[in-house]
From Swiss-Prot:
Annotated protein name in UniProt: UPF0225 protein DR_0483
Family membership: Belongs to the UPF0225 family.
One Pfam family recorded for the sequence: YchJ_M-like
Superkingdom of the source species: Bacteria
Phylogenetic placement of the source organism: Bacteria, Thermotogati, Deinococcota, Deinococci, Deinococcales
Length: 130
């Protein structure tokens, strides 16, 4: 039996999965609940990473540009997100490495330079820069 996932199951007093060092309630939870929008591309990147870690596909889709969002998104694929390192956040781009363990338990790192745009006054993920 798998354990429940999603932001509603992450205690607000625990450290935020984005690795900021702050509690979830003081970091990404207000973005996940829709209480506030992420004010910067880096804050959005961190909140999206936390959403992946918590299997919150609704938030990931909600913060993805409608022209580039995939038709299907499965965050219950057995991947365990283990860390986020921001290398650079400048303008509308954030370069980061996401660490994870695959369903087979093997560690993986994904490095990406993400591009963000403002849509209707809020930041959304556009794509990975080439």
């Amino acid at each position: 039996m798998s354990r429940p996932t999603g932001p509603q199951f992450w205690p607000p007093f625990k450290p935020c999965p984005c690795g900021s060092g702050r509690s979830y309630a003081a970091c990404c939870q207000p973005f996940h609940t829709g209480e506030r929008d992420a004010p910067t591309p880096e804050a959005l990147m961190r909140s999206r990473y936390a959403a992946y870690a918590l299997a919150d596909a609704d938030y990931v889709r909600r913060t993805w540009h409608p022209d580039t969002v995939p038709a299907e998104l499965d965050l219950n694929d057995g991947v365990k997100y283990t860390g986020l390192r921001i290398h650079r956040a400048e303008g509308d781009e954030v370069e980061f490495t996401a660490s994870m363990k695959g369903p087979d338990g093997q560690p993986h790192n994904m490095r990406e330079r993400s591009r963000f745009v403002q849509l209707d006054g809020r930041w959304v993920y556009l794509d990975a820069a080439e």
